């Protein structure tokens, strides 16, 4: 780990004792996992004390099914992927159904989050030429609520609206939290892993009503043509210089 990166990590650990700091090697990419109750306070301190004056991006993440594989590619590849499906995983169910395919058996080399929804922000300090990734998890999967950062970085307004629209994450204190991408009256949040790929409704023109109407999906059958797998394949190995592992400092 570069001396400059190590020094910065030490400063973060000293300033935020309840925050988990991790560094992805060999590039030294620093990430913070912040308790949701401290989300605003930590971000404000990063802006004021560490000169992270710009939030370049904020997004939501749905960890439902994270670390789970749907397909048995070892024994049935020659016979077709559809013969190896075990249960209905993400994308293979209709509206109102729920994924039933396997789970992480604890042998995976990564940590599977206990909470489902996370908010991820990328910060930039131009003064110190640094980038930082900050993440927090909503404590309630049924109604994920995270404090809004609009008072810290006003430009985050539309980013939070997008995360609300696509993931259903409620940003408490946001001045205008409404959908920004989907249509009026849209049902559900399309980037959630339990949102069917077929959607909930389809659009057609009604001759009697002389207008476009929304009706339940009946003409599309849920199917996945690309396998959802987790495997060690050299073709997908990290390029030289890319991050290959993450080291939790604290």
Curated annotation (Swiss-Prot):
NDH-1 shuttles electrons from NADH, via FMN and iron-sulfur (Fe-S) centers, to quinones in the respiratory chain. The immediate electron acceptor for the enzyme in this species is believed to be ubiquinone. Couples the redox reaction to proton translocation (for every two electrons transferred, four hydrogen ions are translocated across the cytoplasmic membrane), and thus conserves the redox energy in a proton gradient. The gene is nuoC. GO terms for molecular function: NADH dehydrogenase (ubiquinone) activity; NADH:ubiquinone reductase (non-electrogenic) activity; quinone binding. This is NADH-quinone oxidoreductase subunit C. NDH-1 is composed of 14 different subunits. Subunits NuoB, C, D, E, F, and G constitute the peripheral sector of the complex. It is found in: Cell inner membrane. It catalyses: a quinone + NADH + 5 H(+)(in) = a quinol + NAD(+) + 4 H(+)(out). Belongs to the complex I 30 kDa subunit family. Keywords: Cell inner membrane, Cell membrane, Membrane, NAD, Quinone, Translocase, Transport, Ubiquinone. Its EC number is 7.1.1.-. Pfam families: Complex1_30kDa (PF00329). GO terms for cellular component: plasma membrane. HAMAP family: NDH1_NuoC. The keyword Cell membrane applies. It comes from Xylella fastidiosa (strain Temecula1 / ATCC 700964).
């Amino acid at each position: 780990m570069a001396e400059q990166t190590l020094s910065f990590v030490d400063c973060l650990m000293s300033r935020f004792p309840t925050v988990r700091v991790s560094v992805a090697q060999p590039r030294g990419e620093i990430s913070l996992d912040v308790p949701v109750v401290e989300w605003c306070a930590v971000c404000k301190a990063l802006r004021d004390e560490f000169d992270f004056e710009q939030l370049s991006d904020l997004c939501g993440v749905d960890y439902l099914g994270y670390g789970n594989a749907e397909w048995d590619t070892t024994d049935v590849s020659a016979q077709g992927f559809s013969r190896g499906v075990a249960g209905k995983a993400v994308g293979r169910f209709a509206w109102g159904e729920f994924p039933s395919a396997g789970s992480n058996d604890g042998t995976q080399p990564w940590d599977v989050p206990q909470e489902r929804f996370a908010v991820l922000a990328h910060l930039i300090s131009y003064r110190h030429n640094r980038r930082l990734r900050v993440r927090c998890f909503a404590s309630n999967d049924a109604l994920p609520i995270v404090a809004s950062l609009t008072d810290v970085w006003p430009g985050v307004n539309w980013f939070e609206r997008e995360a609300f629209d696509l993931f259903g994450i409620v940003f408490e204190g946001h001045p205008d939290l409404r959908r920004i991408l989907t249509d009026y009256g849209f049902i559900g949040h399309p980037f959630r892993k339990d949102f069917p790929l077929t959607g909930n409704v389809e659009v057609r023109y009604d001759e009697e009503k002389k207008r476009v109407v929304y009706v339940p999906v009946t003409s599309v059958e849920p199917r996945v043509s690309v396998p959802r797998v987790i495997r060690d394949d050299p073709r997908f190995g990290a390029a030289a210089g890319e991050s290959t592992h993450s080291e939790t400092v604290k």
